[in-house]
């Protein structure tokens, strides 16, 4: 028994350790080994996907992925409309197009930011809470607020122009108040 217990202690030694040191200071570029037409992740026809916002749709029984459409270059002051996808397997996607457009330069949601979506069985509406970013806010303006848009069918969205959740109303910043994560409570 003692010999069996000592065997693991003698099987390794400092001579077995091989550490290869790399000189990373001369490396300036890493090239991907992936195929140029990488199809693992969704890529829109134009621009890029920003901040995916996944949501399981209990009505359609599929997943919806809302995202910030990033055109690069984006229009000055108004950017990141919310677009959407649907999928049942996270490998094949159907584009839903633009769901929630940016507001105008003078509106609170000139640029849109990340949000989250819930479905209400009570009124059969989808609710997407998102960040509204004001273009060039004055010192009295809130740079970022949480806003909401609703839809009866996940296709046609209506912005509620009376709902503004402002951080400074609750002791938070009026400049940095974004990316709401909304969930349904026990009360529905």
Question: What is the predicted role of each segment?
Answer:
Residues 8-11:
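C-terminal motif of bacterial Sec signal peptides marking the signal peptidase cleavage site
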Residues 13-188:
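Beta-rich carbohydrate-recognition and catalytic domains
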Residues 1-4:
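Sec-dependent N-terminal signal peptides
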């Amino acid at each position: 028994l003692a010999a069996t217990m000592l065997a693991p202690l003698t099987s390794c030694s400092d001579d077995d350790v091989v550490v290869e040191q790399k000189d990373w200071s001369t490396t300036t570029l890493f090239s991907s080994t992936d195929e140029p037409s990488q199809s693992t992740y969704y890529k829109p026809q134009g621009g890029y996907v920003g901040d995916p916002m996944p949501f399981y749709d209990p009505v359609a029984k599929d997943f919806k992925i809302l995202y910030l459409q990033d055109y690069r270059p984006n229009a000055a002051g108004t950017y990141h409309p919310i677009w959407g996808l649907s999928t049942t397997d996270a490998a094949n996607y159907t584009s839903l197009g633009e769901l929630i457009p940016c507001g105008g330069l003078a509106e609170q949601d000139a640029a849109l930011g990340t949000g989250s979506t819930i479905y209400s069985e009570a009124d059969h509406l989808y609710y997407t809470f998102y960040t509204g970013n004001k273009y060039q806010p004055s010192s009295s303006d809130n740079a970022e607020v949480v806003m909401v848009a609703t839809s009866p069918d996940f296709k046609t969205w209506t912005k509620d122009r009376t709902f503004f959740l402002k951080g400074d109303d609750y002791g938070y910043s009026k400049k940095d108040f974004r990316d709401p994560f909304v969930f349904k409570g026990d009360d529905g």
